[in-house]
Amino acid sequence: MKTEKVFLYDNLCDPDLQEELFGEKFDSDQYMDYVTDWDLVAIKINGDLRKVAIEGGERTTIIGHVNYVPLEKLNIMDKHYGKEFIRIKVTTMLDSDCSLYIKRTDKIKKVI
């Protein structure tokens, strides 16, 4: 099965939530990894407070995991994040080339 490496840093790191939303738990690297040069802001999505990565602003280090998402699940994940997010290519601090979902900055309202 072909997969794409996706850096997950929010509630999608939870294997139980992955199974609920996508019908399976994704394989992931067992160690924590990090991405830098992104800002992490709190916003409300469907009434829930979530932290999301955005370009620009304050640069921070985001902690998460590299997950191996089956290619046939990427469209479902894209729909989960919605049109206000884009999937970009990044390299983590542990040298893993992967995708990262970031919030489109033209569509953001910070709450914190």
Spans of features found by a protein language model:
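Glycine-aromatic micro-motifs
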Residues: 1-112
